[in-house]
Amino acid sequence: AFMSIFAPYSAQCEGNFDNLFVPFRAVASDVYHKREVILRNGDLGDAVRASMSFPFVFKPIEIDSVLVYDGGIYNNFPVDVMKSDFNPDIIIGSIVAAKLDKPKEDDLMNQIENMVMQKSDYTLDPEDGILMRFNLSDVGLLDFPKARQIAKIGYDRTIAMMDSIKSRIPRELSQDTRQLQRMVFKSKTPDLVFDKVSVEGGNHQQREYIRRQFDSDEPFSDEQAKAAYYKTISDGKISDLIPHARYDKESGMFNLDIKAKVHDQLAIGMGGFISSTSSNQIYIGAHYRTVSLNSLDLDLGGQIGQSYTSGM
């Protein structure tokens, strides 16, 4: 989804977030070096994805060979970034974070939040802008179904404060002018169409197998790429498949770069039960799978123990 939404705009701005219709910054966290990372350029989808990668909930993403997580770990209210990078006339700050509760024995998410979140400064000088504070104590980290409800709360509060906001703005553009600017910008946004596929990871045969799932004699659309993606990971042989869209100015189309991790070919398991009676059982099983020119699955299992019958 991130690639589908953001790849065309990454291509249009040539990896410089200042060239977007609205200049953008994302904040991520490098937990190894214990510091925040300001993302000003690169892949727009990766930047957005990194800024929401809360530890233990979402997998981190690798940017410039560094695993990065949610920027809120070290800076959950980056007013300093806004001022240093943009020096805006007015900042509208939105605070939805609540004071962390004392860790509870039976609340894993609360324990994780207390472990990873650092204290942030949620102050905004009145001369710098307007601060909105929301009480969302009934909304948890994973309450995605409440997204529209939360957005409406923010919208309604903004409309209620619109007079105060407008009083701080020295000039305005008409809706028609802004709409025309937006149309001109979007007219230069390339369509997400692929004509080449490259695969990194695994051995040669595994890369060829994955590439053939996506490759086509003709350019293919984002929807076709999605179908091939889900088909490739559906059999469980691929542990991770990370796609990136890389724009080619000469062709006007995108290269689909895929980073793959393949499960081990051989998996062995055993189990059984031991009792004080003669009904002891031992089970041994092996599963062998290949990802090559032809995908293959083999299962072998056996058990040792006295035969018995049961009924229910």
What residues fall within each predicted segment?
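Patatin-like phospholipase
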Residues: 1-223, 227-230, 234-241, 245-247, ...
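Gram-negative/organellar outer-membrane beta-barrel architecture
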Residues: 223-224, 228, 234, 240-312
